[in-house]
């Protein structure tokens, strides 16, 4: 019989308070009004979303705000089948990169509003290039999940 | 360019579920194995480099204190390096820089992880900030599944072909691991076992995914003068590269993946390699997921873009192929994360010094070791050769 080796249980619980900063604060206020806000880089002219304080490529401040389209195309996707620690959404769910119309980077979010019971039925409806639009929750908290998901059109 | 640097030996623990000993004792097991392999003593070591995953994996934040006695670092300078999955490669490169700079002649480099003590996927989720990326990425499988899907969609590779190639990689590596005494998961699987396994995150199934492993690895880096004096067959560091992506996950293309290609370019330039598929004899790719290994064949210039599945199915990267990849079984069979990329370096060095045992690639003279980490954010490479 294999020898039993004992272990000792120890849990770590640590609270944190993250500073939001003025740019994300405005972005979250936009979500409460059902607006998706990005900003335009004055150097490369790209529109990046979510809004951020500076362009990562050009390393210059971005002060010009743009309300971007709530429709776009799926760039890539996966279906989460296993629950993960601290996740706000129960599996199965579809995580995806979405290129909103007129923007120059991909937004990470969920695709939903379709039958998620089988990967094969999902693969018929969700592909690279599938058009999707934002579906909003009735109650807003100023959080990315104020957009419940992006639904295939 | 700094001084010439060699790897004079290494040690690994038996990887797997190791609740038979404490974490520091696991670290010591690798250190002692490296001392036996090289014939040196701790008195010969000028400095120690140590690293793990982020502290949430360990449950102890200050690991170089926790491991101080096990590492033999008391009374010596110690450096800690941590870059998530790339940690082991960053450790190796830290050791290399230290010796190349001339500030040390012999450096002990140690990576470790005891993944069964914590919750690896919970730790992986804390690698992401909680408000934008974390809710959508489900630890590592979500990230790599999306990257794999993006790759197949970019080149219109039929799903059946990708599935077949990924299954072959899984079957081959789980069998390769049977010849590696340190490997964690050693299995004889069929193609159907892999293709019909439980879904983790579509399209990734159970045998496409690496395990949680407990394990440690120690590698000794030395100056040319020391290496020639005490080691019959050193593995000479011929090239290295490291490159990272931005934080924002949707900002860059992860298929024609700039940071992987750039890391390889840096390493090939330094090593004088122009045709990696022909010139390299063996590669230890950081392959926590089958699809990730396929993608890297293209990023590293082994296969033309969109052709990795065809080349894999033709056997190019199998043990008896043109460029054997992960003959140790790779990350897919053994993943104590803080040690994992350092194991790639140790395995590459074993191959070019003819010490890889039952998974030795005959006559291997030039080998590539790879580390991948962050949220698909970092790539690092070290190339080692039998000739100084």
Give the positions of each predicted feature:
Chain B
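Active-site-proximal alpha-helical scaffold in enzymes
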Residues: 82-113, 141-179, 219-225, 333-356
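Extended C-terminal subregions enriched in glycine
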Residues: 257-261, 265-291, 299-302, 332-337
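Conserved active-site "lid/cap" helical segment
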Residues: 1-86, 94, 151-165, 184-190, ...
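Beta-strand segments within the central parallel beta-sheet cores of soluble alpha/beta enzyme folds
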Residues: 7, 42-52, 77-83, 107-111, ...
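Condensing-enzyme catalytic core mediating Claisen C-C bond formation in acyl metabolism
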Residues: 1-24, 33, 130, 154, ...
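C-terminal amphipathic "assembly/sorting" segment characterized by alternating charged
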Residues: 338-388
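Short glycine/threonine-rich loop-to-helix capping motif typified by GTGT followed
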Residues: 55-63, 249-253, 286-310, 338, ...
């Amino acid at each position: 019989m294999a020898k039993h080796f004992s272990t000792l249980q120890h849990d770590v619980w640590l609270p944190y308070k993250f500073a939001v900063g003025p740019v994300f604060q405005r972005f979250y206020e936009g979500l409460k009004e059902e607006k998706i806000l990005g900003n335009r880089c004055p150097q490369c002219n790209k529109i990046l979303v979510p809004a951020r304080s500076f362009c990562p490529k050009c390393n210059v401040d971005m002060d010009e705000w743009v309300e971007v389209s709530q429709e776009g195309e799926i760039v890539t996707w996966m279906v989460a089948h296993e629950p993960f620690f601290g996740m706000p959404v129960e599996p199965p769910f579809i995580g995806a990169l979405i290129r909103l119309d007129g923007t120059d980077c991909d937004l990470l979010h969920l695709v939903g509003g379709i039958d998620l019971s089988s990967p094969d039925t999902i693969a018929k409806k969700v592909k690279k290039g599938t058009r999707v639009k934002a579906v909003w929750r009735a109650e807003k908290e100023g959080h990315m999940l104020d957009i419940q998901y992006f639904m295939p059109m | 360019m700094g001084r010439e640097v060699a790897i004079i030996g290494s040690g690994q623990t038996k990887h797997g579920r190791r609740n038979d000993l404490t974490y520091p004792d696991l670290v010591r097991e690798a250190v002692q194995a490296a001392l036996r392999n090289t014939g040196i003593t701790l008195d010969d070591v000028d400095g120690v480099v140590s690293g793990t995953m982020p502290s949430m994996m360990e449950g102890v934040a200050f690991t170089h204190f926790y491991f101080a006695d096990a590492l033999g670092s008391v009374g010596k300078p110690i450096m800690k390096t941590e870059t998530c999955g790339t940690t082991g490669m960053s450790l190796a490169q830290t050791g290399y820089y230290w010796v190349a700079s001339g500030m040390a002649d012999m450096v002990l480099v140690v990576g470790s992880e005891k993944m069964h003590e914590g919750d690896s996927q919970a730790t992986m989720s804390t690698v992401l900030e909680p408000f934008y990326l974390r809710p959508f990425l489900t630890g590592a499988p979500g990230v790599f599944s999306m990257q794999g899907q993006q790759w197949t969609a970019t080149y219109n590779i039929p799903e059946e072909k990708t599935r077949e190639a990924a299954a072959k990689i899984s079957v081959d590596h789980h069998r390769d691991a049977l010849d590696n005494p340190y490997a964690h998961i050693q299995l004889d699987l069929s193609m159907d076992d892999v293709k019909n396994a439980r879904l983790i995150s579509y399209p990734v199934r159970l045998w496409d995914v690496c395990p949680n492993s407990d394990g440690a690895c120690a590698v000794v880096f030395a100056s040319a003068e020391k290496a020639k004096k005490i080691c019959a067959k050193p593995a000479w560091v011929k090239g290295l590269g490291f490159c990272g992506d931005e934080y924002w996950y949707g900002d860059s293309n992860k298929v024609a993946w700039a940071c992987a290609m750039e890391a390889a370019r840096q390493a090939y330039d330094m090593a004088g390699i122009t045709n990696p598929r022909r010139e390299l004899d063996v590669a230890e790719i950081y392959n926590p997921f089958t699809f990730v290994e396929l993608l890297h064949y293209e990023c590293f210039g082994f296969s033309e873009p969109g052709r990795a599945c065809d080349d894999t199915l033709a056997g190019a990267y199998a043990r008896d192929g043109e460029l054997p990849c992960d003959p140790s079984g790779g990350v897919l069979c053994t993943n104590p994360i803080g040690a994992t990329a350092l194991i790639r370096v140790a395995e590459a060095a074993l191959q070019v010094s003819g010490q890889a045992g039952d998974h030795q690639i005959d006559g291997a003279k030039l080998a590539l070791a790879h580390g991948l980490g962050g949220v698909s954010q970092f790539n690092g490479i070290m190339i080692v050769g039998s000739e100084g």
